[in-house]
Amino acid sequence: KNDIDPKGTARPSWLNDIVNQLAHRIIINLNDSATINGINLCALAIMNVPDHTMSISQLEKCISMYLKILNVDPRRRATIPTASPMTLIRQAMELKKFRLYDVGDDMKFVRPSYGQTLQLTYFQNNIVHLFALPALLANIILRNGHILHEDVRSHARSLFYFLRHELFAPVDEKDLDNLIDKHIENFLNEGYITRDNDMLFVSGDGYQEFYILSRCIYHNLVRYLVAVTALKDTEDGKSDVPEFIEKCLSYSKRLPVEVTNNSPEFADPILFKIMCATFIRHSYFYVKEDGKLYVNEPKVQKLNRAATPLLGARDVKILNGQTLSRKVDDVLF
């Protein structure tokens, strides 16, 4: 009561932060109650493969993987569909969002019906936040090939802050390490990865499904690497937040279309503004009274070590502004 201006011309200093915190908690709670069904599970798989085309058998394997991933988190178990993967596929097909192509020899393929790609992206986005953490772990393990369990946990913690704030992923800080270990154990049990002592390796079994899982947040992670690279190249006191956002957009243009797939998110200043807020919240840089940025170099270097392997070596060089000769033939991941 004492903080309210009776004339209505001023707001208390704490109001904006409180409103933002409440809004964030409301969205987190909404995402936590997301409905899981055949159509959004099918969309999550099919929208993350080239040409959005997938065999029925591959789709069944992906949905089976998704259901097992959801079962890792006790909070998800009450909302997991009890129907079989094939039943969920049939339910999705009944909505006419997909077309089935029979090419003979019991080979059937599914792809979006004409004009349905945008709506299927919407269905995918309805549940992608529930897979943000396991998809992040899949990216870290796949892009490194082999990596210590503890390094997976460390890299995941560094990068998940950004996914959580951007996607409003309903994972509490106190539960993060435990969930990371549970997802890794699930990947081991299902044969997607193997372990030798404390070293984790990519397995040949179920590689395609594991890779498709990783793709659902891949562009998010590449954007984080763009922002980290721009921040790493930022001198203290030389630029403000709007200038840094422009720098991120400029760095995004360096990436080849094979990486960005011409996705509009790489040209969206709002997404980089959200990342700036996360950088500030977690002290990757500070904004002083003059509005200029001052970088916390040790934290930025740690984040850079986590993010750099997520992009092929050739594309990392391109992102860093290096000129490549024709002899460079790194394989694009």
Predicted features, each with a name:
Residues 1-333:
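Membrane-interfacial terminal anchoring regions of lipid-handling membrane enzymes
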